[in-house]
Amino acid sequence: MQQRHLSQSAHSHGHGTRRAHRRNTIAIAVATLAVAACGGFGTNGSGGNTGPNVKPAFISGPVGVKSYDGNTDDLLTAGLGKDGLAAAAPAFANPNAPTAVELRRNAIWANYRAIVDVQAAGGYGSLYGPNVDAKGNVTTGQGKVPGTEYIAFTDDGSGRQNVTVMAQVPDGFDVKHPCIISATSSGSRGVYGGIAVGEWGLKHNCAVAYTDKGTGAAPHDLGSDTVPLIDGTRQTRAGAGTQAQFAAQPGASETLAGFNSSTPHRLAFKHAHSQQNPEANWGANTLQAIQFTLWAVNDKFGRTNTDGMRQATFTPANVLVIASAISNGGGAAIAAAEQDTGGLIDGVAVGEPNVNLPPTAGVVVKRGGVPVAASGKHLYDYTTIANLYQLCASQDASLGNAPFAKTAGQAALNRCASLAAKKMIAGGSTSAQATSALDALHRAGWEPESDDLFASLSALEVGSSISVTYANAYARASVTDRLCHYSFSSPGSPPQANPVTAPAAALAGLFSTGNGIPPTTAVTLMNDANPSGAMRDFTSISPSTKLADGNVDGALCLRGLLDTRNPALMTGIGQTYRTGNLGGRPSVIVQGRSDGLLPVNHTSRPYLGLNKHVEGASSRLSYIEVTNGQHFDGFIDVIPGYAKRYIPMHVYVNRALDAVYANLRDGTPLPPSQVVRTTPRGGADTDTVGPRIQPSNVPPIAATPAAGDAITVTGSTVDVPN
């Protein structure tokens, strides 16, 4: 998909020169003094003759604008405050037809909690949270932020893209030191998926640029033919027209009506079924969100001309912009910085980013001076490996006390037997087979620190959910194609768990509660190849093995698309490679060493090497690897055993933002690449909520790391200490 109307960005590979306004410390100081001297950029200030504030041409349809008083409702907590975010979910007055206000409130509640641990014992309210101010001080307030929210679609006029962009402009926006933080949604979430990262910006009186990057939580229900609108409310497909946030299109061989008749009760999700390969455009979407936010800032705070028109007072030349977010959003921020040819972005601060290196990157990753078994694989490559082996590997004797180790039950034992029968692992017993599967994962690049996560990731169907959604996305498949015999539906009662009509209340609330990548609220993966008819994937039977083995046939089919170089899939994958060129911008990446979803050997470690190789001496990227950190802070103090093992990575995402901001504002040097050695809180494997965390559990990033903690790069070889 070609991006249109991108006046300040293009699909650059970043090898050219950047706009001369890119900040160094002196330029920042001069700009700050100049702004202060003219009294800021308020309605009576002088921002220069920059012309009228013109809405970006890529905005399609109306712009929704709402102001929040910071009491009954607000930008950060939707009026819930710090305590409300940690409490039970707010109720809908009519669960079958929640209002837009209710959906927004619950989306903020659910998405905030999905990203951070909201238990006080885990650090909420003391190390982070709405009541912890920009300087880290714990206040007695609720952390509500008054301001104005702007929301709109970007599209080419067809209504097929309809990427949501949103700007939150706090009333306290610092017009003398203007700043914007991007917070692109993580995972496949909707536009509020980056709210926990956006919190940092709001606390620093920055505007925040959000986008759902062409994904989203609410589906097209094919049975009722209803679709989500931008505010999460639902409408018939015909009634929504081009204002549908997502409406599925049929494939080449079947109409939607025909598909719905032969395959009833199915749901289409935007990331999987938009046929747009959204990931190819995540960088461009993030740049659009920043441009939209610049327009919104000017709409609220730009100088007013004599004719009453707002002026484009705030521009890339005088607004500090940091691209931030985590996971897929972090990858989008990096892509945006690589593709930014218009000088929008000044720095990057991301956590656990999904970054894919081209096959020709030539980067070598070492740990403790020894080359790792594998590095630099693409997300689809390593995830389809995980989808095959993690379920069996979770039964290794060394992992008997891992979180959810006993949850998978017979499916895990059968997966081991099926893999052994297909000569994919060795061993004549489940124990030996599990050890062989675990070895296969280590050979594929997982660090041993990730081992304890395999059982819970398998039980939660993480590998299968990502493999299915991304296979469809990369191949630009339609919902009617049922790639590898998978579909999405609400499950009936077990043990059959056949497709049924989605419960009305669950469907109505999915904009708020869903994650956009089934299994999610009341929706699961269906194995349409199950011998007795479509059935929940995890409990289904594989035709080739006649075992309930978590659908090994489906996992092999998804892997086979890569192994056979399926043309559509390979084209889509080829559109997601990063260049490594951040244009010399000050940048910090943080990631947990234990990350079992996006392994460090395939993401941040090799990206550091690629960046240093491409940029050479101009590189200003620091990589911070955190021991005892993993991908899902939201699981800590929720899944028994996580609190014992893992620290909150959100603390280090905030510290990365602090470091980049201090560098851009004050010239404070970035911390060098290093390993930060944390201390888990401890407790028992059966503890859901662990002992209270202390600051000593999460030490700061060192300005000068010890020699044994320094990460080094020589040429394109990265060496991470043990």
From Swiss-Prot:
Its EC number is 3.1.1.22. The keyword Signal applies. Belongs to the D-(-)-3-hydroxybutyrate oligomer hydrolase family. Residues 1-11 have a biased composition (Polar residues). Transmembrane segments: none annotated. GO terms for molecular function: hydroxybutyrate-dimer hydrolase activity. It is found in: Secreted. This is D-(-)-3-hydroxybutyrate oligomer hydrolase. It catalyses: (3R)-hydroxybutanoate dimer + H2O = 2 (R)-3-hydroxybutanoate + H(+). Keywords: Hydrolase, Secreted, Signal. The active site is at 327 (charge relay system). Pfam families: 3HBOH (PF10605). GO terms for cellular component: extracellular space. Residues 1-20, 671-697 are annotated as: Disordered. Participates in the degradation of poly-3-hydroxybutyrate (PHB). It works downstream of poly(3-hydroxybutyrate) depolymerase, hydrolyzing D(-)-3-hydroxybutyrate oligomers of various length (3HB-oligomers) into 3HB-monomers. Pathway: Lipid metabolism; butanoate metabolism. Residues 1-36 form the signal peptide. One of its GO terms (biological process) is butyrate metabolic process.
